[in-house]
Design a protein with these regions (language model features):
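Residue-level preference for the first positions of well-ordered beta-strands
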Residues: 223-225, 257
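Conserved nucleotide-sensing/catalytic segment adjacent to the nucleotide-binding pocket
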Residues: 1-4
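Electropositive, glycine-dotted interaction segments
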Residues: 8-160, 164, 168
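Short beta-strand segments
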Residues: 8-12, 196-198, 291-294
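Short, low-complexity Ser/Thr-rich regulatory SLiMs
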Residues: 16-20, 177, 283-286
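A short, sequence-level motif marking secondary-structure junctions
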Residues: 15-21, 44-46, 202-206, 296-301
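Conserved ABC ATPase signature
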Residues: 140, 163, 167, 171-218, ...
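C-terminal lobe/lid and adjacent interdomain/linker elements of RecA-like ASCE P-loop ATPase modules
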Residues: 242-339
Length: 339
């Protein structure tokens, strides 16, 4: 779902087969009334047609708003139809150019999705100073941080969040450079009456992951979406909630949507009622064995989770999975709203 203007959104979806071949099963783009999550009543921009499973091509029906039958555009199934229509869509009318604008907007938003999976072992080495675009595994974190710290406000934000993690107080961040213009970052930690500089080679996995996560949210373009795999991995349980809170504040400030994944029951048990509105559960469905997402609040009788002790406990004893796969008759839990 992408904001178009004050009245309308763009609703894009794609269904991909991963059985014998990886290719497009279904794909569509609609213009819908702002806030609606259903396609009924929406304006079709394009939608693929059903094809035989063996065909390597797929037809996309394009709504040109002309009298008669909508034209079909032939596309390959091995890549996104959306990306192909960028060059295959006709450019003869205002309607054509309007729809191309919608497609460009969706593609632009998809490009702003940044998946972060920091690998601490790859972050403990010198890198080229000019390598300042953060990579998925964060191997070039030292160059990214050096560039980031040229902005005093961003450096201040970074140190404020990172200082909450280790036992020793972090006073500053520094950089060691070579004659060949390679760089490695270091943290200055304060002890009782002294301080010491520790380069990335000596820092813990948790500290490196935290620094990478904060650096990402401070450097990616505003309006982006940041996906962080296993947010709590390597970070002490007592610090994770503080990190998530700080990330949430930073994300709101920079208009960045943050998607976190976790399997940590302790972290999930600590989620408050308002936070659960943003939680989705990923599970494997029985028929095809594929993974599906469902918003937590869309699970029938989800308040039972709180009766049992919390979201984390429900995940451990599989009662959460049972609520999804074997929903019982909906019960009245309005009495819980007072808690």
């Amino acid at each position: 779902m992408i904001d178009l203007d004050e009245k309308y959104d763009l609703y894009y979806y794609i269904k991909i087969s991963t059985n014998k071949k990886v290719w497009v099963e279904e794909e569509a783009l609609y213009k819908v009334v702002n806030g609606k999550t259903e396609l009924a009543g929406g304006e079709k921009i394009f939608k693929t047609k059903l094809r035989t499973k063996e065909s390597g091509d797929i037809q996309a029906e394009y709504n040109d708003k002309k009298a008669g039958r909508n034209p079909d555009i032939l596309c390959m199934r091995v890549s996104s139809v959306l990306a192909q229509l960028r060059t295959k869509l006709p450019q003869n009318t205002d309607r054509d150019r309007e729809c191309l604008g919608y497609i460009e907007l969706v593609l632009e938003n998809l490009k702003k999705i940044f998946i972060l999976n920091p690998v601490p072992s790859d972050m403990r080495d010198y890198v080229r100073i000019t390598d300042t675009d953060l990579k998925e595994n964060c191997e070039n974190i030292s160059a990214v941080l050096r560039h980031l710290c040229e902005d005093s406000e961003k450096k201040k934000e970074l140190l404020k969040i990172v200082s909450d993690l280790p036992e020793n107080e972090i006073k500053d961040i520094g950089f060691i450079t070579t004659q060949l213009d390679d760089v490695i970052f270091a943290l200055r930690e304060k002890y009782i009456n002294s301080s010491e500089l520790f380069d990335a080679k000596k820092l813990s996995d948790g500290t490196l992951r935290c620094i990478a996560i904060v650096a990402a949210i401070l450097t990616i373009p505003e309006g982006s979406t940041l996906v962080i795999e296993e947010i709590d991995n390597g970070i002490h349980a007592s610090r994770v909630q503080a990190l998530i809170k700080n990330l949430s504040l930073l994300g709101e400030k920079r208009k960045i949507d943050i998607i976190l994944t976790t399997h940590n029951p302790v972290l999930l048990n600590g989620y408050k009622k308002q936070q659960l509105l943003g939680v989705s559960v990923v599970y494997r469905e029985n028929e095809k064995g594929t993974s599906k997402f469902i918003p937590f609040v869309d699970i029938r009788n989800y308040p039972q989770v709180f009766v049992r002790g919390g979201l984390g406990e429900a995940m451990l004893d599989e009662s959460l999975l049972n609520l999804i796969k074997c929903p019982s008759e909906k019960k009245d839990y309005s009495w819980m709203e007072d808690f």
